[in-house]
Each structure stands twice: as structure tokens, then as C-alpha cells.
Amino acid sequence: DRQWSRGLGDVYKRQAHMKFTNVRVPKENLLLGEGRGFEIAQGRLGPGRIHHCMRAIGAGEVALELMCKRGIDPNKVAFGKNLAQLGANFDYIAESRIELNAARFLTLDAAVKMDTVGNKVAASEIAQIKVFAPNVALKIIDRAIQIHGGEGVSQLTPLASMYAHMRTLRLADGPDEVHRRAVARYELGKYMS
């Protein structure tokens, strides 16, 4: 039984929802053993989350580039100044670079920890980046949309589509709240006997 659905951020792909009824799997075809499927899935989620975060950082870089180019475009001038010099745009550009670098370094740290001590030990770092990187990308994309004005939410730039994809990414592999909870439990666990 299969149903297709589309959602925000699924502009280029479709997702199938499959329901299995009365399915039997021979014992020799079981992986790890009966009831251990979630364990297998969890083992693959860490690398997938790193991948999501790298995509988020890439999207943030593209948005920052578009923001900067729009900010210095000689054809986009208001009050005798280019857009980068108006309002808080200088701050937005600086904050975007700082936040992108922080997301990149947190992601690299989590990847190194995964490689050296394994996914289970790196679970807190993975959860942290899964919250941080997509949220940073969303903020930067939103700033880029703002500096582009109405064009930023049109199909003339990739920004609106990028925003939809990054917003969806905050739900992929568990929403932010689940990952924040994991980080908090890890932190509290350090102080409990």
C-alpha cells in the first residue's frame, strides 16, 4: 500500500509512505535480530545528520554570497548608498559569516568525534549540530531575502526555495526539540550520580 505526498521543501522530490500488512521475514533475513531495526536505523542517522548539516552550511554560504553581491550591486542604490551600507546590513553580513564559521566548526568537531570514538559517544555533538546548522542557514537565508526585497521571495533567486528546504530540514531525522532534549539529557547526565 503506497501513497505519495509532497510538502514544503519537497520541490524536487516526492516521498512515499508505505504500509506493510501481514509481512513475514524469514529468520535468516533478519538484520541483527528481531526487534533491532531501530538500532540499525539509529546507527545510520549520525552520518546522515552530518550530511544534512553540511548541506545547511552550503546553503548558508550561497545565501551569504547572494546577500553580499546584492549589497554592493551598483544598480541597487537607496539614499545615495549601496544596500550593504543601509540599516543593519553590515551587521547581518558579519553575523552571517560568524555564525557560518561556528556551524562549520561544530560540524567538523562532530565528524571528527564520530570518526575517532563512534556515533554513540558523539551523540550530543551530532544533536547540537542538527539544531544549530539548519537554524543558522535559515537566519542567513532570511537576511538575504530581506536585502533582496520582493525579489528574494520570487523565483528570480533560489532564496525562497532554499528557505523552504532548510525549514524542512529542521524536521528531518527528528525536530529540533528532540535534539535539544538529547543535548540537555547528556548535560544533566554529567551531574547525576
Enumerate the predicted regions with their spans.
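Alpha-helical interface subdomain recognition
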Residues: 17-22, 36, 43-193
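Active-site/binding-pocket entry motifs
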Residues: 24-26
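Cytochrome P450 core scaffold surrounding the K-helix E-X-X-R motif
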Residues: 29-34
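Single conserved hydrophobic/aromatic residue that forms the stacking wall/gate
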Residues: 1-12
